[in-house]
A protein has these predicted regions:
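Rossmann-fold NAD(P)-binding glycine/threonine-rich loop
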Residues: 190-203
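Glycine-centered, small-residue-biased loops immediately flanking beta-strands
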Residues: 180-181
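Short helix-loop-beta connector
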Residues: 27, 58-61, 84-90, 154-155
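Adenosine-nucleotide cofactor-binding segment
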Residues: 109-171, 219-223
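C-terminal hydrophobic helical "lid"/dimerization subdomain
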Residues: 220-258
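Helix-to-beta-strand junctions that scaffold the AdoMet/dcAdoMet cofactor pocket
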Residues: 86, 176-177
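Mid-domain Rossmann-like dinucleotide-binding core that forms the NAD(H)/NADP(H) cofactor-binding site
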Residues: 69-141
Length: 258
């Protein structure tokens, strides 16, 4: 738990106004972004350790960098390192209309994967399609396990990227192919507390990982390389960031609730 009182926010972009006497990596005037602790990004000024910051290239606006650093790095490590996605891979991605789906799905599409996205409402089906999904399943009115089998047959899915958790876990395991990969990176619907190795892993020789951004940016070189790939993907048009609302800092909470 975060000790209270506390600021909030983990992701921001801005220009450095002051540096400490031992700072070597950046100087006043550099434009940087971050996607990590210490918390407090939703503020006019924020003190950050230099090793958590990344340079923002020309051509990437402050607004886009503020939106893409955390989710972009997440998409990068999921697609390139947790499971290195290949052309022709069949992918199941849950919550495909969300903010991360806006980045990950078109990026996966650019690699040449076939993407099946799940959503939780009728209005989100079109969003998932725009995000690059070749097939969209609304799991509130259809069994996604049955629908996936209709699309790919009984051979199954190469990789499932599951940020939903408890609600989708069993079905995600079921649709994977022999030696498929389960990338469980979130728990929006609740935590999966127990994994039955015999039932969930051994039955099909599955691979399982529970990654987080901290695991994949533990070395500064990893953070820099990941951020570079993200910003290059933005500049090359592999995905586009849609920002629905802008506002002053004092309006942030109202905009979030709206």
């Amino acid at each position: 738990p975060i000790p209270l009182p506390s600021g909030i926010g983990l992701e921001a972009c801005g220009v450095i106004e002051e540096v400490g006497p031992e700072v070597k990596l950046f100087k006043v005037g550099d434009r940087v972004s971050h996607a990590s602790m210490p918390i407090g990004a939703y503020s006019e000024k924020h003190i950050m350790p230099e090793n958590k910051l990344v340079p923002v290239p020309d051509g990437v606006s402050d607004e886009v960098a503020s939106c893409v650093t955390l989710k972009g790095i997440t998409a990068e490590y999921l697609l390139h390192r947790a499971y290195p996605l290949k052309k022709g891979d069949k992918v199941l991605y849950h919550a495909a209309a969300g903010a991360l789906g806006q980045i990950l799905c078109p990026w996966a599409n650019s690699i040449g994967a076939e993407i099946i996205g799940t959503v939780g409402s009728k209005e989100k089906e079109g969003i998932a399609k725009k995000n690059g999904c070749h097939h969209v399943i609304n799991y509130t009115d259809k069994d996604f396990v049955e629908e996936v089998e209709k699309i790919v047959g009984k051979n199954g899915i190469d990789v499932v990227y599951d940020g939903v958790g408890l609600k989708t876990f069993e079905g995600s395991i079921e649709v994977l192919k022999i030696r498929g990969m389960m990338v469980a990176f979130g728990n929006a619907s609740g935590y999966v507390d127990t994994i039955d190795v015999k039932k969930h892993i051994n039955a099909k020789g599955l691979f399982f990982t529970r990654p987080s951004i901290a695991h994949y940016t533990i070395e500064r070189e990893e953070l820099l390389e990941s951020a570079k790939k993200v910003f290059n993907a933005v500049l090359s048009g592999k995905f586009k960031i849609k920002i629905s609302k802008f506002g002053k800092i004092e309006e942030v909470f109202r905009l979030l609730f709206d």
